[in-house]
């Protein structure tokens, strides 16, 4: 190296790393990253080789994230470090909370590389494809076999092979199709039921009412939201007569998270739910009590790498629901609230998560035989599961001194999203002989619980012909 060029290169490296490297580290880095290939390998002429500032300011080897407070402590690959959201309940809370926050990772020479914490978060809305108004592209074709002893329902979605010029890739629509394949079975003799690939509360809550049980369009709005975390698996349940005016239902469900709306890229997090439902027979609402155990997340909020540490999270919940005959139709409603106890972590960058309260609610009205014996009107309004309170506290490295000490930034933020999604929908269906028609009109405010997202209307018109 020529002395003036070396001096200039050292200054560039020192400035690039914000003065965090000592003089010896800078010189060692300059020599270690010099180009020693070809003619530059001749030490008699080029000494340490050709200075390469591009290589000197780029990571050397693997970039790692700290698990402890020192550079000599345990580290994990930065590539595997991040925060994932596989539930819509947090909305934009995490992305807002980490906005403008930075973090440093380290290469194999312990040089710091700065990045944005926000780039390490995977937002739920970036994992999904919005199919509102496109349900008719994959028409549900449930087959219900109803006998005196039992009821069997099997469903999948039939690809209509229509070209709508959607921005969304077709493979994501195919993934959405796969996620709607399920079966349910109800034994009328002993009041037991089993299902796979669907929220396990399909026969509980408002769905005790046989007029509502197989209204598949209501399931995503009125099923117990915590059972969505195991809806990709199998559920077993049974209803027992406890007293002459009280039945008690028991349910166990285990499987992966239904919120993996992007099945192509989503992780497979498994959860288990145990639930009891009290079913009074004196026109009183049903009450549900239950516990959700998630293996690798907290209500779908999970961390990996240096953000790991939320395994085995428990959530308790309670729900109340009812359906009554009113104005010649059925009025139905449900309300659910849950609590996830706080957690702390001695290693990693998530210091703690406080208690998280969450909620969901909905109400609707079903009226049949309005203009003819084969039509019905279904009105509903609901709020999907939403985080009502809770905080996350992070401790991330932001600076290292020339003496190799690491300085941390501790900060916390609310897990309550900026908005509250409310979904209103009206659906009219009618049939004449072998032809069926349906018209859906819906409105969403604060989609995904994000205030900055525009409210929108959607509509869908469909028809079917029985051959």
Task: Locate each region found by the language model.
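Proline-poor, low-complexity alpha-helical tail modules
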Residues: 447-467
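Hydrolase catalytic cores
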Residues: 1-48
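Outer-envelope beta-barrel architecture signal
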Residues: 160-162, 180, 190-194, 242-248, ...
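Secreted peptidase-domain scaffold signal
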Residues: 54-154
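Residues on the lipid-exposed face of transmembrane beta-strands in outer-membrane beta-barrel proteins
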Residues: 182-186, 236-240, 274-282, 318-324, ...
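Transmembrane beta-barrel domains of Gram-negative outer membranes and organellar outer membranes
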Residues: 115-235
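Glycine- and small hydrophobic-enriched segments that form the cores of compact globular domains
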Residues: 219-223, 233-238, 244-279, 291
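Outer membrane beta-barrel transmembrane domains
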Residues: 213-217, 221-226, 249-251, 264-268, ...
């Amino acid at each position: 190296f020529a002395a003036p060029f070396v001096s200039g290169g050292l200054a560039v490296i020192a400035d690039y790393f914000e003065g965090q490297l000592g003089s010896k580290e800078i010189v060692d880095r300059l020599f270690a990253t010099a180009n020693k290939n070809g003619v530059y390998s001749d030490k008699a002429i080029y000494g340490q080789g050709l200075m390469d500032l591009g290589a000197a300011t780029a990571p050397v080897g693997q970039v790692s994230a700290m698990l402890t407070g020192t550079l000599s402590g345990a580290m994990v690959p930065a590539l595997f470090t991040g925060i994932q959201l596989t539930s819509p309940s947090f909305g934009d809370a995490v992305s807002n909370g980490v906005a403008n926050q930075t973090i440093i990772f380290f290469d194999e020479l312990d040089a710091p590389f700065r990045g944005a914490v926000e780039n390490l978060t995977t937002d739920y809305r970036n994992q999904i494809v919005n199919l509102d108004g496109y349900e008719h592209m994959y028409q549900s074709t449930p087959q219900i076999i109803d006998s005196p002893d039992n009821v069997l329902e099997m469903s999948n979605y039939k690809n209509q092979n229509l070209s709508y010029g959607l921005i969304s890739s077709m493979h994501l629509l195919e993934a959405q199709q796969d996620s709607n394949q399920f079966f349910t079975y109800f034994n009328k003799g002993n009041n037991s039921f089993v299902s796979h690939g669907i929220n396990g509360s399909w026969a509980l809550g408002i769905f005790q009412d046989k007029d509502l049980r197989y209204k598949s369009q209501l399931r995503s709005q009125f099923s117990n939201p915590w059972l969505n975390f195991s809806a990709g698996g199998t559920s077993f349940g049974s209803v027992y007569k406890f007293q002459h005016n009280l039945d008690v239902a028991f349910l166990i469900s285990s499987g992966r998270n239904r919120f993996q709306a992007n099945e192509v890229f989503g992780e497979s997090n498994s959860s288990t739910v145990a639930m009891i439902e009290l079913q009074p027979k004196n026109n009183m609402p049903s009450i549900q009590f239950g516990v959700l155990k998630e293996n690798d997340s907290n209500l779908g909020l999970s961390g990996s790498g240096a953000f790991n540490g939320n395994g085995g999270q428990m959530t308790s919940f309670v729900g109340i629901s009812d359906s009554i005959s009113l104005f010649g139709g059925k009025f139905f409603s449900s309300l659910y609230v849950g609590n996830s106890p706080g957690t702390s972590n001695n290693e990693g960058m998530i210091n703690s998560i406080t208690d998280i309260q969450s909620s969901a609610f909905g109400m609707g009205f079903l009226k049949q035989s309005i203009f003819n014996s084969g039509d019905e009107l279904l009105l509903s309004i609901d709020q999907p599961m939403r985080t009502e309170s809770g905080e996350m506290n992070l401790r991330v490295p932001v600076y290292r001194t020339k003496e190799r000490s690491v300085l941390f930034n501790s900060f916390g933020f609310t897990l309550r999203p900026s908005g509250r999604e409310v979904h209103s929908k009206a659906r009219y269906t009618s049939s004449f002989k072998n032809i069926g028609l349906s018209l859906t009109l819906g409105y969403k405010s604060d989609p995904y619980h994000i205030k900055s997202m525009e409210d929108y209307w959607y509509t869908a018109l469909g028809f079917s012909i029985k051959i």
